[in-house]
Amino acid sequence: EIIARYNFEEACFLIFFQLFERVGLYWQVGAVFPAQEHFVTNLFRQKLIAATDKLNIPATNKPGILFFLPENELHEMSLLFYSFLARKNGFNSFYLGQSVPFNDLVKISSQKEVDFVFTAFVNSILKEDLEDYLVQLKEVFPKQKIFITGHQVQEHSPKLPRNVKTIKDYQEFKKYLG
């Protein structure tokens, strides 16, 4: 019903992500237990993957974007949504998912040519560790623009290597997609 009222993109931003913020708060204060939060999250995850599949956009000559979450990062809803937006705009999306070991990124960088890299930092991380990770990521993907987002990025405002760009919200990312 919500998706019928809004388009899928608007429903995600206006309804679902607001719901996740509330569910997260309820979970933190003990009003919702983890299985309830996982149930809601996985329902939405299924809808998001199905919506991405329904796009049915053939491979194009548009740039490719590699989407991944760093090791031990499991919060993939925003990453899935950004991947959906990229696909919707005709970009080739290579979605690696959660908790990708850094050494795997090194291997992928030599095997798969991409134009952009996109990752998110939601789990707690020290500012210095975040900055070190970004420097290492820049070394692995020196020619690509790297987009980063997430609560930890906003909280720490890390010093960014020259090819790294912070994405504050989905409207800003859509501007890059054209």
Predicted regions and their residues:
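Long amphipathic alpha-helical segments
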Residues: E1-N56
